[in-house]
């Protein structure tokens, strides 16, 4: 209880008094800041007859830091209320610069002389509730009153206790009994099956016998108390799935109310697709309880979060909607905490998407997802969105398969790069929409590329300092390969951040790829398409055109495309991966496809067209590259190593370790070859078996001709293990060794600091067989040494000790 002495003392020293009257540490939809939306807030009340100038006063959550947030010049009228929002990184000086933890905390108010004026120690508060004063007593408020007096009729003593339930979420047999227990005899339990806040008609008075899959939401009520926080459970009965399962517990009216439900057309929808004006086009969030189960129905993640309908013109109007899952700071758990994607070692995500397939809905339903997974597995240098197909339930009712994906936003950068999401610049489309941060730096990059000749290395290097060029190339090549005609003017994002200043592209939405856009060959030539006048004003294409003026970049671009056509873009490899992904979800499509799309047979047919596109793509691209860059047609070459296993090879951007390697490249566009010799082997030369040409450098550049076969030729180390006696020795040792081929020999002795202290060469050839050499060590100081025996084929080492 607040002391009257405290108020009197403050009036005496400051000529007025004020009180921290109410606090809301988890504001979702109660009080909206005009500039920043729904933020935590605190209310100050002036209980005096005089107006107050708050300048010089301060708020803090740290008693030892009384000036943490100073009030700006604000006059608070007599008996008036001032509501102040809070944000950890505010833009306006009128916003408190720290947050209020929902689990409880203390906020202090200090005078200009750092004297404590007031404080409020608040307990854990549920979202949208507040805690404040009525007649010097603190109450909980289910209906906060920012800017107005607190109402004793709406004040509560606290919260009822959440009921306990005997069984956690999972799979159970028919007839299993669910028992709920109140913590106190004065508390009554209510529950619902449709995700709605339970009402009095759903009174719990006896165990529930499971007869079907159920999603239960339960609360407890008590006199003078706010209803307890909800408890959620999902019980699967006679369910069997080969994919992980997501259940979304949600007030069914929030989704399906004809007037207000976010899944529905609503009263203002245009009659024809994509039904602009429909409820599902609104950026409206609703609260849900999210649960994620593995295929054994074991609960692996669960949290309160928000959802909103997700996607563009090709997605939102579909019968099954894409849903964005949004972790919120207002709840106990802000991040989805599980390793959802096998392809990435990540286990924290602020946002996830349950995607319907977008433009691929009721086709393969997985095209974009399968391509992303494949390119991640292939190690391409692009920011890609991992994929995990899941079976979705809503309030315990089967809904269908959706593609769980990473969200292409600033929190993707946080999860994948461990960077501050508030320091990310994320731009969208050809128009460089500022999704987050600012476009200033990227506009400067575009202007520089357009205003300077990048054929000059000085200018090219400046762009290279601003742009991750290797990633830029891989990003463009993926889009060009799949022939994505919903790009590059749309479905494009690029980012940089403090700590990662080079711009990178974030790839998403290839739904319209892997199919023909017309009947003729030019319609499939995607590089020629983006370089023509149709997209000439696109800044991303302008950067590519500027870079292509540089001879080194142009050679890299062509060779990288060829490298990928020979590996990651290989038709057999891509379609094998798509087939694996198809097989992974096939057992579930028998329920999903008829529910939403029609005959399951038509689903299988969708993959025939994809295979036809993939099978013909390499030839089309080779033809296009030759045409665009005025090159001869591609030629076939082979890379090999002799003897087998003696070396690996770096071919342009490819690290080769399996031989022979066969690929296609362009004559007049030089390729790079580097031999990387394994330990115990000696490099002799590169040999072109077609021409018998030999090159004696490890790193070479060659102009490929048809049927070239470049081979790394090596010698194995043919020295048998050496034997030294006596060892330790005083003055003389005998070195015994065997050779499998004739060779000159050199013996050297090195001290432990690496200094050569003794060396003897034997230029005459030692024949194949066993040999002995006597050595005088009398000139050496006592100690430990390393003896090296070197031949034309290798080197062996052994430790010796001089007494």
Go through the PLM ranges and name each one:
Residues 47, 95-148, 303-315, 586, ...:
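Conserved beta-structured recognition patch
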């Amino acid at each position: 209880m607040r002391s009257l002495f405290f108020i009197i003392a403050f009036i005496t020293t400051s000529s007025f008094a004020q009180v921290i009257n109410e606090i809301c540490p988890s504001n979702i939809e109660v009080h909206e800041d005009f500039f920043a939306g729904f933020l935590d807030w605190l209310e100050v009340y002036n209980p005096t007859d005089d107006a107050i100038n708050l300048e010089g006063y301060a708020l803090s959550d740290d008693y030892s830091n009384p000036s943490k947030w100073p009030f700006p010049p604000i006059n608070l009228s007599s008996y008036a209320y001032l509501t102040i929002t809070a944000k950890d990184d505010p833009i306006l000086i009128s916003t408190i610069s720290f947050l209020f933890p929902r689990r409880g905390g203390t906020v202090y108010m200090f005078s200009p002389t750092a004297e404590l004026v007031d404080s409020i120690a608040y307990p854990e508060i549920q979202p949208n509730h507040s805690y404040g004063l009525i007649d010097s007593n603190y109450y909980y408020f289910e209906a906060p009153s920012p800017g107005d007096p607190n109402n004793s009729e709406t004040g509560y003593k606290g919260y009822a206790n959440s009921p306990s339930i005997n069984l956690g979420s999972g799979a159970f047999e028919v007839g299993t009994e669910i028992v709920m227990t109140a913590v106190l005899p004065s508390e009554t339990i209510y529950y619902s099956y449709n995700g709605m806040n339970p009402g009095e008609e759903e009174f719990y008075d006896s165990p529930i016998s499971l007869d079907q899959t159920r999603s239960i939401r339960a609360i407890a009520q008590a006199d003078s108390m706010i209803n307890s926080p909800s408890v959620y459970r999902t019980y699967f009965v006679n369910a069997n799935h080969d994919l992980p399962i997501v259940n979304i517990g949600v007030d069914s009216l929030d989704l399906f109310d004809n007037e207000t439900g976010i899944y529905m057309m609503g009263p203002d929808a245009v009659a024809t697709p994509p039904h602009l004006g429909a409820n599902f086009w609104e950026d409206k969030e609703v609260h849900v309880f999210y649960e994620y189960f593995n295929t054994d129905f074991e609960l692996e993640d669960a949290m309160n979060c928000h959802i909103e309908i997700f996607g563009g013109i090709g997605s939102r109007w579909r019968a099954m909607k894409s849903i964005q899952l949004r972790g919120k700071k207002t709840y106990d758990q802000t991040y989805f905490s599980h390793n959802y994607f096998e392809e990435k070692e990540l286990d924290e995500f602020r946002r996830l998407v349950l995607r319907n397939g977008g433009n691929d809905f009721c086709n393969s339903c997985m095209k974009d997802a399968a391509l992303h997974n494949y390119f991640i597995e292939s190690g391409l240098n692009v920011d890609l969105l991992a994929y995990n197909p899941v079976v979705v339930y809503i309030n315990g009712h089967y809904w269908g398969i959706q593609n769980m994906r990473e969200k292409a936003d600033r929190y993707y950068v946080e999860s994948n790069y461990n960077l501050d999401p508030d320091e990310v610049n994320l731009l969208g489309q050809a128009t460089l929409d500022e999704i987050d941060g600012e476009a200033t730096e990227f506009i400067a990059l575009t202007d520089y590329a357009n205003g300077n000749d990048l054929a000059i290395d000085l200018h090219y290097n400046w762009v290279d300092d601003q742009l991750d060029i290797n990633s830029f190339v891989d990003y463009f090549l993926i889009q060009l390969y799949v022939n994505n005609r919903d790009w590059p003017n749309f479905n494009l994002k690029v980012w940089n951040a403090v700590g990662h200043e080079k711009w990178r592209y974030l790839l998403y939405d290839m739904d319209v790829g892997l199919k023909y856009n017309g009947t003729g060959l030019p319609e499939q030539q995607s590089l020629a398409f983006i370089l023509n006048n149709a997209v000439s004003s696109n800044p991303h294409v302008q950067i590519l055109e500027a870079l292509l003026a540089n001879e080194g970049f142009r050679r890299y671009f062509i060779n990288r495309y060829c490298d990928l056509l020979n590996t990651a873009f290989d038709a057999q490899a891509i379609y094998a991966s798509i087939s694996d992904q198809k097989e992974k979800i096939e057992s579930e499509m028998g329920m999903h496809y008829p529910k939403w799309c029609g005959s399951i047979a038509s689903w299988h047919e969708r993959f025939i067209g994809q295979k036809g596109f993939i099978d013909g793509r390499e030839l089309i691209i080779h033809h296009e590259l030759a045409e665009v860059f005025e090159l001869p047609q591609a030629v076939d070459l082979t890379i090999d190593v002799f003897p087998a296993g003696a070396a690996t090879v770096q071919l342009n951007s490819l690290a080769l370790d399996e031989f022979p390697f066969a690929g296609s490249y362009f004559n007049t566009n030089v390729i790079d070859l580097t031999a990387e010799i394994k330990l115990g082997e000696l490099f002799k030369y590169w040999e072109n078996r077609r021409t018998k040409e030999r090159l004696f450098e490890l790193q070479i550049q060659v102009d490929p001709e048809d049927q070239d076969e470049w081979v790394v030729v090596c010698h194995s180390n043919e020295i048998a293990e050496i034997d030294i006696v006596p060892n330790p020795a005083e003055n003389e040792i005998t070195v015994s060794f065997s050779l499998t081929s004739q060779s000159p020999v050199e013996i050297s002795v090195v001290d432990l600091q690496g200094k050569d202290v003794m060396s003897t060469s034997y230029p005459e050839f030692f024949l194949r067989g066993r040999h002995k050499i006597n050595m005088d060590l009398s000139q050496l100081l006592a100690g430990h040494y390393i003896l090296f025996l070197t031949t034309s084929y290798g080197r062996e080492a052994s430790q010796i000790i001089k007494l």
